[in-house]
């Protein structure tokens, strides 16, 4: 007779679950309160979301040491803590953008804010597990919320974008589920560490099922990180989303996705599957190069920023190619530096949101011509947007430059000199399309003379967020050393 297996409830460990549980409790509270009292303003929901995020941040910072719980499915280590901090801070910076002067449909309904918190909980699950099933659960929670948030913009293009994202996301989920099945079939485990041990001990690195699992999981991750050739959904989805959500999508989901990729690809390389590194090398080069080339020919600034985010993802992927301690530190540092500049760029697009007067190409919301001669109409806007463009181009002394410098330094230490040169060449290409917007703002004649059209969506909340983004972008060199030490401590503690 088979022995009956008993589950030890002490393994649940509410402390490990507390970041995700608390976020879901806050989201449920919004749903209950919103259903009972329907006249609450978006100010209440935004402030409540920020409080929820900072409570969660406090819980995260309270962790001390490695913790493996929930029947070995939840992992709290340095990698998960630092990624949770980035996700929570980025979320806290983006949610106030809902407090624009114009009241858009999605920001007037309480479901938006509940879905936003549920989405964050999904990202936290993704980065806090070494178990493929829990990662898949977090991936689907966050993705389903994100599809809905995009559609809530209540525009034809938004619904189209949500459907496209849903279709691509469903394909990605299918690939991920197939990968889980393949790995379980070959190793009898869905735990990343145990899969790696089984592949190494049983010499399964040439096993057909394992190879298929690697292909499926690489494809799923490629979709989520918008790596070439899995990038085609990005420009249309960004264009159909409102600017704050597009900016959020360019950072937080990718941070969560890169943590999953870091854990999985490090395991596969360590278990003797050497071709993974070569595959990542090729994809990184293609993603950087082709995305930059496609960004050159864009006529809409938001679409340009979409391809720009793909190119930056290709740059960060180089850290996974090196797979060294320094490169892993550079991965986190790069996303923090990129956060400020990209937050600022998309915030400025949200400031310039104006549907009332259209005197440019009606196919696009943010064509380059919209910003023509802005230095003569609204000098402060032109200067601030110029700072963000220069920063994204990787020009010193602004934030992204320091991220690239640390990453390139780690690649050179790992003897990836050619890859470092490719990053530099692509950075030079990117300068063109970032400076193109600056040329329109500073050297072209204005099309619209009324500055109120450009600032009709401005609010105090937007000014504060833009101010934070400017400060983080311009003064990054002052705190970059402290951030690097902070990241290095957590990455070292995780053994990466």
Swiss-Prot record:
Membrane topology listed for this record: Multi-pass membrane protein
GO biological process: ATP synthesis coupled electron transport
Compartments, as annotated in UniProt: Cell inner membrane
Gene Ontology molecular-function annotations: NADH dehydrogenase (ubiquinone) activity; NADH:ubiquinone reductase (non-electrogenic) activity; quinone binding
Keywords: Cell inner membrane, Cell membrane, Membrane, NAD, Quinone, Translocase, Transmembrane, Transmembrane helix, Transport, Ubiquinone
Keyword Transmembrane (UniProt): yes
InterPro entries the record matches: NADH-Q_OxRdtase_suN/2, ND/Mrp_TM
Catalytic activity: a quinone + NADH + 5 H(+)(in) = a quinol + NAD(+) + 4 H(+)(out)
Primary site of residence: membrane
Transmembrane segments: 16-36, 46-66, 79-99, 116-136, 166-186, 208-228, 245-267, 278-298, 304-324, 331-351, 382-402, 422-442, 464-484
Top EC class of this enzyme: translocase
GO cellular component annotations of the record: plasma membrane
Protein EC: 7.1.1.-
Pfam families from the UniProt entry: Proton_antipo_M
PANTHER family noted in UniProt: NADH DEHYDROGENASE (PTHR22773)
HAMAP family xrefs: NDH1_NuoN_1 (MF_00445)
Self-association state and partner proteins as the record states: NDH-1 is composed of 14 different subunits. Subunits NuoA, H, J, K, L, M, N constitute the membrane sector of the complex.
Protein purpose: NDH-1 shuttles electrons from NADH, via FMN and iron-sulfur (Fe-S) centers, to quinones in the respiratory chain. The immediate electron acceptor for the enzyme in this species is believed to be ubiquinone. Couples the redox reaction to proton translocation (for every two electrons transferred, four hydrogen ions are translocated across the cytoplasmic membrane), and thus conserves the redox energy in a proton gradient.
Family: Belongs to the complex I subunit 2 family.
UniProt-listed NCBIfam families: NDH_I_N, PRK05777.2-2
Name recorded for this polypeptide: NADH-quinone oxidoreductase subunit N
Source organism (scientific name): Campylobacter concisus (strain 13826)
């Amino acid at each position: 007779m088979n022995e009956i297996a008993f589950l030890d409830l002490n393994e649940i460990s509410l402390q490990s679950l507390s970041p995700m549980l608390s976020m879901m409790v806050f989201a449920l509270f919004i749903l209950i309160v919103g259903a009972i009292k329907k006249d609450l303003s978006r100010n209440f929901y935004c402030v409540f979301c920020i409080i929820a995020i900072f409570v969660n941040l406090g819980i995260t910072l309270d962790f001390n040491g490695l913790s493996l719980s929930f029947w070995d499915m939840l992992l709290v280590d340095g990698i998960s803590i630092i990624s949770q901090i980035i996700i929570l801070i980025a979320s806290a910076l983006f949610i106030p953008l809902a407090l624009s002067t114009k009241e858009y449909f999605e920001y007037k309904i309480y479901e938006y804010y509940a879905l936003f918190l549920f989405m964050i909980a999904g990202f936290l699950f993704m980065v806090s597990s070494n178990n493929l099933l829990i990662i898949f659960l977090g991936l689907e929670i966050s993705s389903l919320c994100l599809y809905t948030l995009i559609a809530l913009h209540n525009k034809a293009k938004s619904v189209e974008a949500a459907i496209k994202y849903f279709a691509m996301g469903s394909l990605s989920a299918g690939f991920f589920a197939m990968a889980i099945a393949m790995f379980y079939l070959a190793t009898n485990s869905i735990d990343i560490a145990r899969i790696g041990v089984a592949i190494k001990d049983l010499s399964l690195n040439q096993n057909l099922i394992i190879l298929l699992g690697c292909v499926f999981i690489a494809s799923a991750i490629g979709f989520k990180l918008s790596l070439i050739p899995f990038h085609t959904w990005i420009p249309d989805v960004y264009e159909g989303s409102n600017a704050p959500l597009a900016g959020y999508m360019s950072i937080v989901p990718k941070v969560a996705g890169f943590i999953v990729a870091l854990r999985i690809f490090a395991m596969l390389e360590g278990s003797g599957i050497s071709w993974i590194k070569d595959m990542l090398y090729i994809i990184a080069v293609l993603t950087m190069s082709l995305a930059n080339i496609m960004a050159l020919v864009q006529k809409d600034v938001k679409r340009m920023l979409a391809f720009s985010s793909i190119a930056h993802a290709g740059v960060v992927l180089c850290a996974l190619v090196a797979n060294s301690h320094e490169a892993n530190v550079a991965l986190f540092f790069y996303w923090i530096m990129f956060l400020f500049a990209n937050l600022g760029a998309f915030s400025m697009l949200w400031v310039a949101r104006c549907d009332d007067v259209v005197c440019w190409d009606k196919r696009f919301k943010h064509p380059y011509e919209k910003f023509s001669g802005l230095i003569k109409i609204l000098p402060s806007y032109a200067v601030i947007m110029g700072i963000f463009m220069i920063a994204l181009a990787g020009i010193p002394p602004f934030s992204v430059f320091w991220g690239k410098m640390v990453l390139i330094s780690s690649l050179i230490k790992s003897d990836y000199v050619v890859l470092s040169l490719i990053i530099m060449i692509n950075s030079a290409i990117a300068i063109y399309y970032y400076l193109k917007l600056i040329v329109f703002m500073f050297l072209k004649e204005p099309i619209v003379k009324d500055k109120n059209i450009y600032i009709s969506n401005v609010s105090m909340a937007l000014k504060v967020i833009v101010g934070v983004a400017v400060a983080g972008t311009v003064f990054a060199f002052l705190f970059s050393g402290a951030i690097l030490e902070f990241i290095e401590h957590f990455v070292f503690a995780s053994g990466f």
